[in-house]
Amino acid sequence: MSIGLDVGSTTVKRVIVEGADVVSEVCLRHLGRPEALARELCTEARRRFPGRPVGITGSIGVALAERLDARPVHEVPAVALAVRSQHPEVASVVELGGQDAKLLFLDRAGDAEMNDRCAAGTGATIDRIAARLGLAEDELPRIRLRGDLRVAAKCGVFAETDCVNLVDRGAAPEEVFAALARAIVLQNLAVLGRGRVPRPPVLLLGGPHAHLPVLAEAWREALGGAWADRGVAAGPVFVPAYAALFAAIGAALHAARGARRLPIVSGVLDEPPAAPAPRRDPRALASLAARDEPDLLGADVAHLHLGIDAGSTTSKLVALDGAGRVRFASYAPSRANPVDDARARLEALARAVERSGGTLRIATLGATGYGADLVAAALGADVALVETLAHAIAARAVVPDVDAVVDVGGTDVKVLRVERGEVRRFALSTQCSAGHGAFLAHAARASGVPIEAYAAHALDAARVPRFPVGCAVFMDTDRVTLLRAGFDAGEILAGLAAALPRNVWEYVVGEPPARWGRRFLLTGGAHRNLAVAAAHADYLREQVAGAEVSVHPHPELGGAIGVALAAMGATHGPTGFRGLDAARAVRVRAETSEATRCRRCDVGCARSLVSVHGGDATPRELVLGNACERGAARDDAVTGRRGAGHAPNGLAYEVARLFRRPPESASARANAPRIGIPRAMGLYRSAPLLLHYLAAAGVPPDRLVLSPPTSAASFHDGAAGGVHDPCFPSKLFLSHVRWLVRQPIDVLFLPALTHARIAVRGTADTASCPIVAACGHTALAALRRDGDELRRRGIRALAPELTLTDPGRLERQLLDAFGDLLGIDERTNRRALEVGLAAQRRFHADCARFGGRVLREARRRGSAVAVILARPYHGDPGVEHGVSTELAARSIPVLSITTLPADEGGLLDLSGILPEATNSGAAEKTWAARAIRRDPRLLAVHLSSFRCGQDAAVASTLAALLEDLDRPSLAMEDLDEDRPGVSFGVRLETFAHAVRRYEAGLGAAREEVVA
């Protein structure tokens, strides 16, 4: 008999094992007291079974081994030991815990993988989202896999926002939870599998698997498809008894074998770094304190100006008097659809007015937040405003000459650069939850501190431990580690408050705060916490010489106050608000399902169809979630015609001409091999050359098989099998390859395009990104990692190196690759290459002519033009997520780098700027930035994929060229597999508003060169 303890980030588990049988089990949450609870359970077990060996494991347990006189073992061997004891037939194990995930391959020399950079896809994410969806704990085991909604689980906090938004838009909570289960499975397959697929039998362990049958269903669905693709016979995927206790069982078995104690490595587990708490002037501290909640209604209030912030996590309402003073505020977590939440806030106002003895008279109503359009349509708002602009208006009302507004909310961060009252640039969080306020509330609860007392505890701390910046869930693990190291709750809360500004500026913004100005206004609910406000002010004063930092008097209400002020200033006649009685009667019906998905292009946007009726409102039907105007119509009978305000889109023009089918050659052979080519990565630069070359070499165009444009479905179908995870486009490439190998093709053509032929000169080289050049080989590695899938399907792989900058070398490379395959000689090969090169030249000439026409028309109309600074593969609508289409739909003409005319005058020569540059994409972006700098009608829209190393290297050069221009700009530098619709809409609408204001001042002013 032996005793096993598993002390993890949230629970302590204890088992007593006799032989291979579990005779006793306990699982308790430790609530921030892991050592005390582990000691209590260990002491009790030793009292009952004296002299029995004790093993211990878990993220916290190993560090407690010496103090508890237990034998430590790491979680992975502990789980493997228990599995071999309980289920020796198992080949693969997937374990999900509260904050970690593991994949064990027991049939392959014991390989194991764990999540390393992010805790998305673990139990903590599931628990939090289930609570937000209003699903009771006893409901979760009854949920089954159904529907076809999609949720991105790359970050747990943003997965939560996706899920809540889907429910708000009419999706059934159970169906959304099923979508979350699918997303978590795909996330773990991608992060843990790295191209390897678990072989059957597969054992599912951990608390989430033990309690949620829908997860097991999702694993069976995903693995069944993966096994079918690879020709692997299907097998069992099951959850065993004691699924949550296998690590503890393994620890007990480890101890029973008389295992030695692990040596302690000095220096590795030293006390975490901490600094003495800063000494703050009480008066300076008091100046950062937010005001108490307003409750100033009285009989004297005749007319109120209302602002509603229909946020994804919180619904807020403020009432201003004619002088702009806040007389009433109401806010609560968002629970139903935005209209129902707004109605609840209005009822709270009506009750407060009635208690005060006054009469409710509403002069104006404004709406902002993600639900603003719906609230405005249902209630008759006078103004609907994007939330960035609302925050800027509220900030200017407090600090008229503010430079930067820093809004930290529960699940998002916004930083706005304000110049002469206009938002010139901004940064919003999209792909990671680091730096958000919701985690602080969670940490306070977990530490037993009421959120209202957070600041008092943190400001009283003697020490401030240093937390690393990054994932909020991993920071929670660090919180538990610090508790174990002897830091008290107040010190830990102080450390978290100090980490927040570093997360905002280092992780979300990615730039020094000095680039954003000197006068900062802090807003958002997180800054109502005085400890957070003080830490943020300290950070800014350390980073920016002479920084002036203030906190909005009502930081949690900034958006609502701003839109109320906007409505007050914009409404000069009767309000459009239909009245409280009408608000009570209005009804909103929303539907989000696979039936509402847009089918008008391959992207397949997940739309919601919303109908508003009753309460004197004109019946309306709204379409939400569409990325372009083609998806704005409810029925499929609508054609793809552009709306009247649709501007030219150079990126779409470029892509349409890239993939024009070449004419059939007179030498075309009906028996030529069917060649599959992925429509991804380097093909977005070289398609005319390669397609026309192959056609001229004798391949009929109908035997050139291109994968379709990227869609969410195609990505999820293929990306889970990647062998690496550097960036979204590289993962996407494998999805295109997997689509092709399922087609009846003979050859899979994956050229390694090492260099690009570009107009820019004066750099050391024009090499492709190494990931672009190598993506074909990494795709082949993935296809061969679990057996040779290409050989099984009878497909020949062709992955030649092609040097586009050297025609002579390229000619030899193409002959080596296709000479025998197509039966062509040197002469035919040379002529085919000449045809391909001519097609590439025509493509560039067509694009330049299109750009010239757009610029001439813009000058004639006095309008600005957005120039997309992006890599060629961002032309894929699934990679750029429809950014160019949405800009064009907002009447902003769009040019790509390829359609921007290459005007001479020295701009193409980068020898004085980037003489040592080697990357072609970086060189093209720099040239385009110089062109933008010269022409005041051109506005920069920078697109970059999340974690793009090549773009990071040129970021400072682009900033130096663009940041001092007094023009609107848009940075979408974190494009990834998920498209956070709320954040995208906010950024695009903010930019569009700034462009309209800029054009009003631009007029027909003559061009001037910016020195």
How does the language model describe each region?
Residues S2-T43, D111-A112, D116, I308-E347, ...:
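Short glycine-rich, Thr/Ser-proximal phosphate-binding strand/loop in the N-terminal lobe
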Residues L31, R108-D148, C155, A244, ...:
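Glycine-rich phosphate-binding loop plus the immediately following alpha-helix
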Residues I60-G61, G193-L223, P240-A244, T368-A372, ...:
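Glycine-rich phosphate-binding loops at beta-strand->alpha-helix junctions
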Residues P72-V76, R220-I249, D382-L389, A537-I561, ...:
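Conserved phosphate-binding/catalytic loops in two-lobed NTP-binding clefts
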Residues N115, A119-T125, R230, C432-L440, ...:
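An N-terminal assembly and electron-transfer interface module characteristic of large anaerobic redox
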Residues G123-A131, F238-A274, I393, G437-H442, ...:
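Glycine-rich phosphate-binding/hydrolytic loop that grips phosphoryl groups
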Residues T161-L192, T477-E506:
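Adenine-nucleotide phosphate-binding core of ATP-dependent small-molecule kinases
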Residues A179-P200, A286-P294, A348, A352, ...:
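Phosphate/ATP-binding catalytic cores across multiple sugar-kinase/actin-like superfamilies
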